Amino acid sequence: MSNVELRIENIVASVDLFASLDLEKVIEICPHSKYNPEEFPGIICRFDEPKVALLVFSSGKLVVTGAKSVDDIQAAVSKLVEMLSKIGTKFGRAPEIDIQNMVFSGDLKMEFNLDAVALVLPNCEYEPEQFPGVIYRVKDPKAVILLFSSGKIVCSGAKSEHDAWEAVKKLLHELDKYGLIEEEA
């Protein structure tokens, strides 16, 4: 497993700012933003640094997406809080950030016969006419891994990098248990 690589592709977090927001004022201070209350009840705000998108609601709740690290989420929230403070927004307490989903891409550095994998691997689906990968569901930690014949994987649903690694370890354990991992010469 030492040669397996995982890379964060996206992190989604929900945030509570513990403040009520006047979205008409907020839209004026958010660069690269869009607000059309007839279509959507929040502001869609994009930051270039860190490169994320935020959905900002009058309740003071946010959804942050597009982040490549938890630090990016914290930086984006801090940046927004600083901007909101300048227009007189009062906060009940420090923002609360809750990671909802992390998406990783990876490479197991080996190829797989997905028909063979689907025959023996529990908790998986494989419909090659509809999707070219095996969908493997891990219950604990909760995650879904897409496994392709090239050995490339996508892991989603994890709430931390540790959870993603644990899910990948479980997949590798199952693949090994059923004799689906070729030993390198």
UniProtKB/Swiss-Prot annotation:
- The record's sequence repeats, renumbered to this chain, cover 8-84, 99-175
Keywords, sorted A to Z? DNA-binding, Repeat, Transcription, Transcription regulation
Similarity field: Belongs to the TBP family.
| Job of this protein | General factor that plays a role in the activation of archaeal genes transcribed by RNA polymerase. Binds specifically to the TATA box promoter element which lies close to the position of transcription initiation.
> Which InterPro entries does the record associate with it?
TBP, TBP_archaea, TBP_CS, TBP_dom_sf
* Lineage, opening ranks: Archaea, Methanobacteriati, Methanobacteriota, Thermococci, Thermococcales
Q: Name the SUPFAM superfamilies on file.
A: TATA-box binding protein-like (SSF55945)
PROSITE patterns assigned to the protein according to its UniProt record, in alphabetical order? TFIID
What CDD domains does its record include?
A: TBP_archaea
* Name of the protein in its database record: TATA-box-binding protein
Q: Which GO terms describe its molecular function?
A: DNA binding; DNA-binding transcription factor activity
Instruction: Show the coiled coil region(s).
Output: none
Q: Which Pfam families match?
A: TBP
One GO biological process this protein is involved in is: DNA-templated transcription initiation
